[in-house]
Amino acid sequence: MQTAASCYNEIESMKLAIVLSGSQAEINWNALRLANLAMGKGDKVAIFLVGEGVEYEHYNSDQFDIKKQVERFLDAGGEIIACGTCLDLRKQAESAVCPAGRLDDWYRLISESDKVLTF
């Protein structure tokens, strides 16, 4: 008899889009941890930053080491795109870990993904 846990092991890899829209360090840290777990299981993961989510770098701490999670995610081939308008509204420049994108990029991530998670 198959258990629920063994059924999960048979799931094919998927494309996962994660939308970060807030600035709460713990929530963003957990979203990034999930993204890294999914990447480790062979899934393709992309993150779109919108609203306060574009400020995620500013909320790094010893307890919630967001920078470490981001480095791990990018090193594994993950993609991060930030809403360019949201960056502009906050007078924040794009960076290697927060590159500017457009609504077209957000739409592409959603339409090409098997699952979309929002945090």
Q: At which residue positions do the language-model features occur?
A:
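Short, Lys/Arg-enriched N-terminal segments with co-localized hydrophobic residues
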Residues: M1-S13
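Charged helix-capping and loop-helix junction motifs
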Residues: L32-R33, D62-K67, P99-R102
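A glycine-rich helix N-cap at a beta->alpha junction
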Residues: Q63-L89
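C-terminal structural segments of small proteins and small subunits
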Residues: D88-F119
